[in-house]
Amino acid sequence: MKRLIVGISGASGAIYGVRLLQILRDVDSVETHLVMSQAARQTLALETHFSLREVQALADVTHDARDIAASISSGSYPTAGMVILPCSIKTLSGIVHSYTDGLLTRAADVILKERRPLVLCVRETPLHIGHLRLMTQAAEIGAVIMPPVPAFYHLPQTLDDVINQTVNRVLDQFDIPLPHDLFVRWQGA
């Protein structure tokens, strides 16, 4: 069984993290470990109709963002990696500078030092040079920078179609197969 850490930061786009958890709930080969920042809790309430309790119930294990002694805070705890979806600039900055002031950034720091996959779905626009430098630095230390940028070749009809495409592409980064793809993959012209 793969253990995947799912981080949700306070950036806009909490629905991406929720949808990822919804999809993985039905994948028996994956155990999810959720950690949400305090700002993520606010964003969740502002942007969705999901309660904190409902989102936490989607995860196999939920960790308090203040618990720096949690299992996922140690490299000796085996995981398949971590995704932060969405990833705020504050969280990105904390990761790049090894400023592990809570479990979200501590778990990401552990993933990097253990050379496991870390996918950062940075959600900000427009970007200034400081943001771009942070993303470059994160990539240099081993993270995958994967902004949730929609694709249109699969002809999305709804917002769910756009969200599903991003979530499916994130799962591709961890080699997590789904019973069926959430979008139509490009087959060539």
From Swiss-Prot:
User: Which EC number applies?
Assistant: 2.5.1.129
Coiled-coil region(s): none
UniProt key word Glycoprotein: no
Residues holding dimethylallyl phosphate:
153, 169
What name appears for this protein in its UniProt entry? Flavin prenyltransferase UbiX
Any GO BP: ubiquinone biosynthetic process
Where, by residue number, does FMN bind? Answer: 10-12, 37, 88-91, 123
Q: What enzyme class is recorded for this protein?
A: transferase
